[in-house]
Amino acid sequence: MNSLVATPPVPPHFYEYSRLSSPHPMSTPTHTPINRKRKADDDGNDHDGRMSASPTNSPAFTPRSLPAPRSFKRSRPNVSGRPLSLPRLLETLDTDALRGILRSMCERHPALADEVIHTSPRPSVSSALQVLRNYQSTLQNSFPLGGNPESDYAYNRVRQPLGNLLDALSDFTPHFLPPHETQASVSLSYLDGATDIIHALPRWHSPQNNIERDSAYDEICKAWILVIREAAKRGGGIQLQYGGWDQKLAKHNQNAGGRLQAAVNELGNSLGWMHGPDSQGYGSSTGGDLVSVREQLLSGTYGLGTPVKVGPW
């Protein structure tokens, strides 16, 4: 008995799926042998790509984060104006500004003045003479152009810088005198330079205007006498004998018009005492011979022209 088996109905959504999906060919596509072969360069490119890929999924390599470079500058997230630090502020100040600030601070705080005096280095002869030369240069630049530089008008124009120079000279000179200064060579070097500065002071027609210049010569003459006496007591007066100070002081006395004659006499007495009683005629031929022999000994030329005897004496 033939029976018909009814085909179960297909749900409608199956038809909808088949309608929306793209149809695929049922037949197996045929490929030519050329398409099935792989080129050698393709294999190489594929191998290079696999080797260059980072093995992020491999358990043998763990990713590490590189340390951040150290920054030597502090981060300043908020940019705003601020005053300079003290070291940077001092770098912008010149010598005159620093001197003025330090002077005002010492005036307001007297205890700070003693600290500055004990902390500051001892002034040298060159630095002190340089300060005096600066005052001297200011004095020379203060003269009026044209006219008579020795007149009363010129004196009134330069009276203030002239007073500043003389005040500085009177302040620096005691600093280089004994007993504050123990080295005779330092004292003599300062007096030599300070006397040259006094020689350069202007001369005036009016005698009353020359009183300050004459007073400066008197003070420097007393300083010379004090230093000569102290130098004669120390080390046998070696600084006076071998420094050529007799000639230097004689030249200063000549430029001063004889106002340093007392210092010249003091130096002559000291050198005469050191040479002994037989050398009363200091500066004579005998004294000149002694000076000549002394200079030869110091220079190492003594006895070079004397023939040397060979054989039994």
UniProtKB/Swiss-Prot annotation:
One Gene Ontology term, aspect cellular component: nuclear membrane
Biased segments, Basic and acidic residues type: 39-50
Keywords from the named record: Cytoplasm, Nucleus, Protein transport, Transport
Main location: cytoplasm
Localization of this protein: Cytoplasm; Nucleus
Gene Ontology biological process terms, A to Z: nuclear protein quality control by the ubiquitin-proteasome system; proteasome localization; protein transport
Gene3D superfamilies, per the entry: Tethering factor for nuclear proteasome Cut8/Sts1
Region (Disordered) residue spans: 16-84
Coiled coil: none
Pfam families xref list: Cut8
Regions of compositional bias (Low complexity) in chain numbering: 21-33
Entry GO MF terms: proteasome binding
PANTHER family per the UniProt record, alphabetical: FI02826P
Protein family (similarity comment): Belongs to the cut8/STS1 family.
Subunit relationships: Binds the proteasome.
Function: Involved in ubiquitin-mediated protein degradation. Regulatory factor in the ubiquitin/proteasome pathway that controls the turnover of proteasome substrates. Targets proteasomes to the nucleus and facilitates the degradation of nuclear proteins.
Protein name: Tethering factor for nuclear proteasome sts1
Source organism: Aspergillus fumigatus (strain CBS 144.89 / FGSC A1163 / CEA10) (Neosartorya fumigata)
